[in-house]
Each structure stands twice: as structure tokens, then as C-alpha cells.
């Protein structure tokens, strides 16, 4: 599977942004219970499948002339000690408004029972980063006033962190300040709807944070790097597919694999294509010309 972008143009025709990235919807279903899946992957906690859980993430909002842009977490270099310090400052406010204790603190992700915020419509940082946050802020769904309550808590934390020594030290080192808190992924494990193809998978490959929790939920072994000696009945979420295509091509030609199913998301829509060894060398219409090998560039551009 290769990551795709949301159908943003289609979304702009509506009042609300697209719900989730296509790969998020493909793996987890339309309810998008990202937070409990991340929690399952990052901790040894026994996660209640019927408990709505939220993911809170310390972030940097970059100010332009007329709007704010959410930076990706990979761009802010938040350390474990900084994460602990920032949570300690914000914890009383978070737990008071959520009416729950924080369940688990990772370096980048904090998890808590969603409580009164369970009905919020949210978007992951993967989807919202690099964009004007006005359109991607949490919205009310079936309960009015919840988004306003979140903005109040968010503003309180922003003021606390603005004067926090963590940000003073980061500024001295030339790092972006941690100036806001993002909420996303609200849902229950019971809401997961995995694709049928995972029913026959014996191994999951990839380093996306969602995979560790999803593999644990499905009781399927998972590892970050692909073991090319173990490719049959496997699922891989690949960031740089061009870097492994030659290995996969060799596995098909060597009959180590019968077929490869490529899943991608052109214009936000799920596309499945199956390739066998017969597809690897397409004969030109000019029969006297040598057949050309199927490259990843040809696959992804078709």
C-alpha cells in the first residue's frame, strides 16, 4: 500500500473538510478510531474496546501574515523530557475538562478517555499539517458547544506554554516553540472496520505508527523493515516503494510470489491492481523491439 492524499478539491465544495486520509479510512473504516489504535501500539495497556479515546499532541502552529499553519511532528523535534514537562503544566487543565485521567503519555502522543469531547469531528496531523488550520479545527457534530469547549482549553494551554521554560530553551536552540495542543483520532476499538484482505495476511511490514496497533489488534506479527525472504501473504505500507520494487520484481520472476497487489489512492479514491510475472515485461507493438521492464514509475503514473 502506498499513501495518498485526500480529495481536497472535492472537500472544498462542502462545508467541512474530507474525513480522514484515504489510507486511514482504508485500514480503519469510516469511523477512523485512530487514537485507540495508536494507544494499543504504543503501550501495554488493556484498551477497553468500547471506550472513546482521544489523542492529544503538542504541536507548533506557524504564523503567516493572515493564518496559522500546522507543522508536522517530524519538524518540531520534541524530546521525551520536553514532552513530560509540557504535560505536567497542562495536566490539571486537561484532566479537569476531560473529566478523566491521562491514560498514557508517549513522546509525541498523549491519550485520554474522550469524555465530553467524544462527539468532536477531528483530523489527524498527517492530514492537516502544512495547511491553514482554520478549516481543520475540531467541529461539533451531534452535540453543540463541544468545539467551543475545546478551543477554550486549547487557548488556556497555549498561554501556559507561551511562558514555559521549555519553549524559552527551545528558542535559544533555534527550534520552533511548542505553542498549541492538537486533538484527533477520537474513537473506539470496537469501531474498527479492517479491509477483508487483511484476513489472509500472516505478516505486516512498515513503520507507520498505526501499523503497530493495528497488528496487535489483529494478532498479526509486525515489523518495520521488510524481510524479502518472507513475502508470501504479507501486507506492507511503504513510504518509498521505488526503493523496493526491484526486490519485489525479482521475487515475482523467481516464483517466490504469485502476484503483488498494489493499493494506492489517486484523487483520494482507493485503487487495487494485481501484477504477476507476465506483467513485468510488456512487449512493444513493434515486435522486433526488445520488451521493456515494468518500472515503479510506470505503475504509479498509469
What residues fall within each predicted segment?
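…; additionally, a secondary subgroup of soluble metalloenzymes is captured
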Residues: 1-302
Amino acid at each position: 500500500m502506498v499513501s495518498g492524499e485526500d480529495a481536497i478539491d472535492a472537500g472544498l465544495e462542502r462545508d467541512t473538510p474530507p474525513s480522514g486520509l484515504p489510507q486511514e479510512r482504508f485500514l480503519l473504516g469510516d469511523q477512523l478510531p485512530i487514537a485507540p489504535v495508536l494507544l494499543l501500539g504504543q503501550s501495554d495497556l488493556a484498551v477497553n474496546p468500547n471506550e472513546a479515546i482521544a489523542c492529544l499532541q503538542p504541536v507548533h502552529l506557524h504564523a503567516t501574515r493572515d493564518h496559522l499553519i500546522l507543522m508536522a511532528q517530524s519538524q518540531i523535534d520534541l524530546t521525551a523530557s520536553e514532552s513530560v514537562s509540557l504535560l505536567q503544566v497542562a495536566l490539571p487543565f486537561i484532566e479537569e475538562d476531560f473529566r478523566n485521567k491521562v491514560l498514557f503519555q508517549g513522546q509525541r502522543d498523549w491519550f485520554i478517555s474522550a469524555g465530553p469531547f467524544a462527539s468532536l469531528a477531528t483530523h489527524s496531523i498527517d492530514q492537516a499539517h502544512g495547511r491553514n488550520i482554520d478549516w481543520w479545527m475540531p467541529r461539533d457534530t451531534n452535540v453543540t458547544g463541544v468545539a467551543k469547549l475545546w478551543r477554550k482549553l486549547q487557548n488556556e494551554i497555549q498561554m501556559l506554554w507561551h511562558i514555559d521554560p521549555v519553549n524559552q530553551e527551545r528558542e535559544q536552540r533555534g527550534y520552533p516553540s511548542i505553542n498549541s495542543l492538537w486533538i484527533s483520532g477520537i474513537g473506539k476499538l470496537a469501531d474498527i472496520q479492517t479491509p477483508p484482505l487483511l484476513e489472509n495476511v500472516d505478516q505486516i511490514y512498515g513503520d507507520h505508527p498505526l501499523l503497530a496497533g493495528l497488528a496487535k489488534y489483529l494478532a498479526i506479527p509486525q515489523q518495520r523493515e521488510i524481510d524479502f525472504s518472507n513475502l508470501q501473504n504479507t501486507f506492507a505500507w511503504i513510504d518509498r516503494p521505488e526503493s523496493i520494487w526491484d526486490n519485489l520484481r525479482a521475487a515475482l520472476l523467481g516464483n517466490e510470489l504469485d502476484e503483488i497487489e498494489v493499493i494506492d489512492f489517486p484523487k483520494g479514491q482507493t485503487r487495487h491492481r494485481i501484477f504477476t510475472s507476465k506483467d513485468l515485461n510488456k512487449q512493444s507493438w513493434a515486435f522486433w523491439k526488445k520488451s521493456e521492464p515494468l518500472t515503479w514509475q510506470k505503475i504509479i503514473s498509469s
